[in-house]
Amino acid sequence: MRILLIYMLGLSGIACASSIKEIVKESREKLEKGLGYKLSSSEIRMLRRLFEKNAGLETRVVIPVILHQSKVVVSPGTRYRDIEEGERKYVEKVIKLLPEVAWRSITHIYALANNDWAVDLMYDVFDKASSWRSDTVALYKGTEKKYGMKFTDLVNGIFEQNNCILKEFGRLLADRVEILIQELPGSLDDVEKKREEEVLRKIKEYGRRLCTKEKQDEIIKAQRIMCNVCEYIWKREEDRKSFIMEVYSTYLKLREMESNVDEIEEPLIYFVDHRGLINACDKYKSMDIMAELILQLFLQGKNIDDKSIKSAVRSVRERKRLEEMREMEERKRREEERAKNEEELLRMVEREKREESKGRGKKKGGKRGAGEAKEESKEEDRKEEEGVEVEEEESAEVPLVETVVGGARRKKKGSREKKMGEEHHYKVHSRVLRWKKDAEKIKRELDKGSEERWKGKSVEEIKEQKKVHDIVEVSELLRDKEKCDRFFVRTGKYMKGGSERWKMVANGILEEGGEKKVGKVEVGLFKGGRGESVVYHLMFRPTETERTGMVGGSSFGEGDDVDEIKKEKSSDMSGFRYPSGVRCEMTSNGNEFRIEYRNRKNTSEVLRTLTILRIPEIL
């Protein structure tokens, strides 16, 4: 939430105000208009702390990815020649904006004054340097002899160019802030004046640091690490899918805030502690650990600190341990198979020797014996051929077991049977199905249940929870493995309450009463007693806040808030259907799966709509 608030403010162009109180008020109004709801008191306090403690000086990096609608048109390692012909015009438009985006990521601050002098200063210094700045599009395209550079190389080069004018900007910023400190109005009380002065001194100190080579090198190194890590993440399919899903989620949120635009025509800026990023890289010198750290920042909303770094190190070591175990098992399997083949070969050699010896003995017995041997040999050959046919035929009838959605298992039909779309069989736990009931009945069940956090909630609170939990129709999308893989990303497995658990996560938009919320559709699963997968958790979680739920944390985070699951309380939903037109209508066009929940008494009235979005296609 903290990162998202600053992110929204940075891109929506908050004007400067004369005091922290005014800038918080101005920011609050803009955010509430964009988010479509009133900020809670805790969110307002968070907003105030952001300006008091940080003054908008948190360090940022550019994510080396370009999105267009629901597609990734440029990835970290993309060269210009790799871009689809139909997307090149759009990409060139974005590339032209890159120098400004990179500059804004370093110099955009929230200053306190009666005008937006800080923004003017930022653009004045940038515009003066336009005469000697390279043509970024031409640079990216390359020449006939050269095939052009990777997108990450272009981004890094632009940051290096911008560093040439940082010293001038830092000097002008520090000088201007010193004047503002002297001109603080006498009408402010001592407490407010001290607070304003502290914020301005932080900005002044930041300006002075920008003049130093140490700070300039830090900015370049942090961005270079980010580019290298993103390129590394892109090589691993599961990490790539979850990474791009989170980038796309932020992209969707910005589009919802800027409701008057269809596209965000620039790469995204993300808030990362430069010094923490560099220290972690220098200490561990491991791309695996850095990739895991960045994924945790993106997927779980963590900051770079000792806790998150240790978590990344543990995750990498555990993954390597499991990989080594799998490699050992594979080596053992290959050795056993080789020994088996050698044993079979020895048996074949011995059999051939016996047959040769037997053949020589029968030849000594006369012509009849030779003829019998020949007929016997033919008969054996015929039986062996028939035996192969029978064996192959029988093996075709033996059902094969294949791991499908969420680790569940199903039988794969033999080659003789008609091939059908791969379907996932699973069960749905009663704690998911209960949200179909009326709020009053749900409340009675929860008050009598074993989950303490749900006890004592009002009917109104339950009604709000029902909006984000009563989405069992999502199960329809999970049945088809191919469709499911296009929409959902699987997280790693973990143990809790004596059961093996995992999640599947997709991007979604919930619409109700003219209000749209971007968030994640979460599916929590555990392995049942017979090895089947059981859905025990299903909800839509808005990304901008946890205010709709009594559950916190990230959709991608390992772990959940359900301590123990009563495994016997689940139902086989493989044949479940709501009566057509009574509760909801489901449609899909390949890129989105849409569920319209309707008034049971008047089915023409749409109460709410949940749209699950496909993972962005990578061109």
Swiss-Prot record:
Residues 350-359, 369-385 have a biased composition (Basic and acidic residues). InterPro entries: DUF3654, UPF0329. It comes from the Eukaryota. Residues 386-396 have a biased composition (Acidic residues). Residues 350-425 are annotated as: Disordered. Belongs to the UPF0329 family. This is UPF0329 protein ECU08_2070. It comes from Encephalitozoon cuniculi (strain GB-M1).
